[in-house]
């Protein structure tokens, strides 16, 4: 019984990780980028920066 329990547990964990990995990665990337941008561009307004990035991303996705 111990063996079976271990196996089922690892299986469920791997499934959960696969689903959640992409989201976590994206969040980490965004957080890091935004932090760096803040440090570098203290003068530039945050709104304009985010808007520009969002538009460029949308265009790229639609065209390609």
From Swiss-Prot:
Cellular compartments annotated: Nucleus; Chromosome
Tissues where this protein is expressed: Testis.
Stretches for region Disordered: 1-64
GO BP annotations, alphabetical order: chromosome condensation; sperm DNA condensation
Main localization category: nucleus
GO MF terms, alphabetically ordered: DNA binding
Entry GO terms, CC: nucleosome; nucleus
Keywords: Chromosome, Developmental protein, Differentiation, DNA condensation, DNA-binding, Nucleosome core, Nucleus, Spermatogenesis
InterPro entries on file: Protamine_P1
Biological function: Protamines substitute for histones in the chromatin of sperm during the haploid phase of spermatogenesis. They compact sperm DNA into a highly condensed, stable and inactive complex.
Protein family according to the UniProt entry: Belongs to the protamine P1 family.
Official protein name in the record: Sperm protamine P1
């Amino acid at each position: 019984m111990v063996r079976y329990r271990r196996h089922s547990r690892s299986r469920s964990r791997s499934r959960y990780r696969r689903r959640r990995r992409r989201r976590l990665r994206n969040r980490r990337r965004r957080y890091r980028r935004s932090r760096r941008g803040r440090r570098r561009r203290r003068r530039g307004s945050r709104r304009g920066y985010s808007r520009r990035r969002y538009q460029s991303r949308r265009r790229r996705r639609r065209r390609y």
